[in-house]
Amino acid sequence: MDIEAYFERIGYKNSVNKLDLATLTEVLQHQMRAVPFENLSMHCGEAMCLGLEATFDHIVRKKRGGWCLQVNHLLYWALTKMGFETTMLGGYVYITPVNKYSSEMVHLLVQVTISDRNYIVDSAYGSSYQMWEPLELTSGKDQPQVPAIFRLTEENGTWYLDQIRREQDVPNQEFVNSDLLEKSKYRKIYSFTLEPRTIEDFEYVNTYLQTSPASVFVSTSFCSLQTSEGVCCLIGSTLTSRRFSYKDNVDLVEFKSLTEEEIEDVLKTTFGISLEKKFVPKHGELVFTI
């Protein structure tokens, strides 16, 4: 696996010698704007593979995206290869409909240490919950970013990531009450500990997320990519976009239902994805939100 091929895939052309916060931020932002957070393979009858070589081939060579077990695994590898001090961590996603965190460790994230300061780096949460900058591992501190205000809180060795969101404007009244629209201004995202993990720790959940009827990845097809102004998502056959702060403290959220032909075109033009097999969009009871 070639780190230069990775840099080309994410469009990163700047310094690889300065292992500082600015470089870390640039790599994160290049990856999140080049590599979609998506589960389309599952809805094309293909498996989501866990191994690093398979992930590199899928994302770098085939120019696809993936979910956190792939996308953040690749980021972890790249940052380590560059010389950053990295630790793989595992997270428990907050499940809004049941108001609790997942019982299984379903999210992979990365800790990076720079000059004795620890940062959380995550390029694979997707939608409008995606951080645009590394988060300093400090409890109780509001960390404003373009998407929202993020806050990390530590309690008895467990860290909690929350998000404080803006007001939102939805011009298409048909979708004002849609289950695709995030309606909370204060949003719990996930919890995690600082216990080091390996990719093997995620083998069970990699299978579970692809097979369990309780998995949102089984219920709904999803593709999300950050842009310079916000984020675009394809949820089932609905194209959604959120433009951050399009006016003072208000996000613009737009929705459009797509035909089968339009979906193929949008995947290519908006997300840079050309699928090899037939894609069957799915919007079940369990959905992602924008």
Swiss-Prot record:
EC number: 2.3.1.5
Main location: cytoplasm
Positions that bind CoA: S103, Y208
PANTHER family, sorted: ARYLAMINE N-ACETYLTRANSFERASE 1, N-HYDROXYARYLAMINE O-ACETYLTRANSFERASE
UniProt KW keywords: Acetylation, Acyltransferase, Cytoplasm, Transferase
KW Methyltransferase (keyword) present: no
Binding positions for substrate per the UniProt entry: V106, H107
CC annotations in GO: cytoplasm
Catalyzed reactions per annotation: an arylamine + acetyl-CoA = an N-acetylarylamine + CoA
Keyword Ribosomal protein annotated: no
Residues the record lists as N-acetylmethionine modifications: M1
Broad class of enzyme this protein falls into: transferase
Protein's recorded name: Arylamine N-acetyltransferase 1
List of catalytic residues: C68, H107, D122
GO MF annotation: an example: arylamine N-acetyltransferase activity
Subcellular localization: Cytoplasm
UniProt xrefs under SUPFAM superfamilies: Cysteine proteinases
Family designation: Belongs to the arylamine N-acetyltransferase family.
One example of a Gene Ontology biological process annotation: liver development
